[in-house]
């Protein structure tokens, strides 16, 4: 695959040789045989709505079925996706993106600059209640919109024609390009969302896709589904896998047993299994980016208001 979208989010996995070949081969020769990957999640996904997702399982799916201005390639290097060219002003506060003209949604609609404008305004609108809307901070008027002091239309983003997008920042953001590869900033199809109403993104059939895969079979609560190659994806020739079969497996021991029996192409390992299997065929370690924290409930337990106690 052109991007590393399907690499495991866990630090340690066991993967079969066939899996690694399907996900990581850079060969210009493509096999005539259809390629299927049997993968797993450690938790249920909750939504396909990039504006409302907060969990890793949902973001893994969104990253594979949707696409933004950039994607993360090898070694997490930012590379162009929907953006064909980018200009940044001398003061670092104005970004201009040219969007590729051959990108389409799975319903046939073209992906345009207006899809980004709509998406960002929808996400940052307090009515949407996006838990990650704070990530827009630094974009012109974002903080004021989140706090309800300004309307979403005041956000520093505009479409200059069908395929040119301009973003205005309040200050230089050194990690801005990296931020644009996060699903929260992906485009959204306004016509489709308004047609679906409250059903939007609650199951596979209530979703429209512009990424390398389409999701099928997720009802909103079941524990297995598939990704299938998206025939309308602009770079479909670079997508090596035809199908990815997902299932939710919550315990490492179950993962490993299914892997051993050939029912999974990879398995997440717990600390004990890591020690015993380290160095064996298929054992793989990958760095992961994560933030963990503890949050004190000061309403239920007022004693936690004492900062000395918390320390």
Where are the regions a protein language model picked out?
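Aromatic- and charge-enriched surface segment that lines or borders ligand/interaction sites
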Residues: 84-132, 303
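Ligand-site clamp/hinge motif
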Residues: 232-275
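C-terminal motif of bacterial Sec signal peptides marking the signal peptidase cleavage site
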Residues: 20-22
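Alpha-helical secondary-structure segments
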Residues: 112-118, 162-166, 242-243, 291-311
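Short, well-ordered beta-strand elements
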Residues: 33-46, 84, 94-97, 116-119, ...
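Surface-exposed binding/hinge segments that line
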Residues: 133-190
């Amino acid at each position: 695959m052109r991007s590393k979208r399907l690499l495991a989010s866990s630090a340690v996995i066991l993967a079969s040789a066939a899996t690694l070949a399907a996900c990581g081969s850079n060969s210009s020769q493509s096999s005539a045989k259809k390629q299927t990957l049997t993968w797993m999640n450690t938790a249920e996904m909750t939504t396909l709505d990039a504006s409302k997702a907060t969990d890793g399982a949902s973001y893994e799916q969104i990253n594979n079925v949707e696409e933004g201005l950039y994607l993360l390639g090898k070694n997490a290097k930012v590379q162009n996706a929907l953006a064909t060219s980018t200009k940044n002003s001398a003061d670092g506060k104005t970004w201009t993106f040219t969007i590729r003209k051959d990108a389409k949604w799975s319903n046939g609609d073209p992906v345009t600059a207006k899809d980004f404008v709509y998406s960002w305004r929808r996400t940052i609108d307090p009515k949407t209640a996006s838990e990650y809307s704070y990530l827009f901070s630094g974009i012109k008027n974002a903080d004021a919109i989140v706090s309800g002091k300004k309307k979403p239309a005041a956000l520093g983003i505009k479409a200059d024609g069908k395929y040119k997008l301009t973003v205005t920042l309040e200050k230089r953001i050194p990690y801005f390009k990296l931020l644009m590869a996060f699903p929260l900033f992906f485009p959204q199809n306004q016509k489709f969302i308004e047609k679906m109403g409250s059903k939007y993104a609650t199951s596979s059939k209530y979703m429209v896709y512009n990424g390398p895969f389409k999701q099928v079979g997720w009802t909103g609560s079941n524990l297995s589904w598939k990704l299938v190659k998206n025939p309308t994806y602009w770079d479909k020739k670079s997508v090596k896998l035809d199908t990815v079969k997902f299932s939710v497996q919550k315990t490492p021991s179950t993962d490993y047993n299914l892997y051993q029996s050939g029912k999974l192409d990879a398995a997440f390992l717990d600390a004990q299994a890591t020690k015993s299997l380290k160095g064996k065929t298929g054992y793989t370690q990958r760095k992961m980016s994560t933030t963990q924290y503890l949050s004190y409930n000061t309403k239920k337990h007022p004693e936690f208001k004492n900062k000395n106690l918390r320390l």
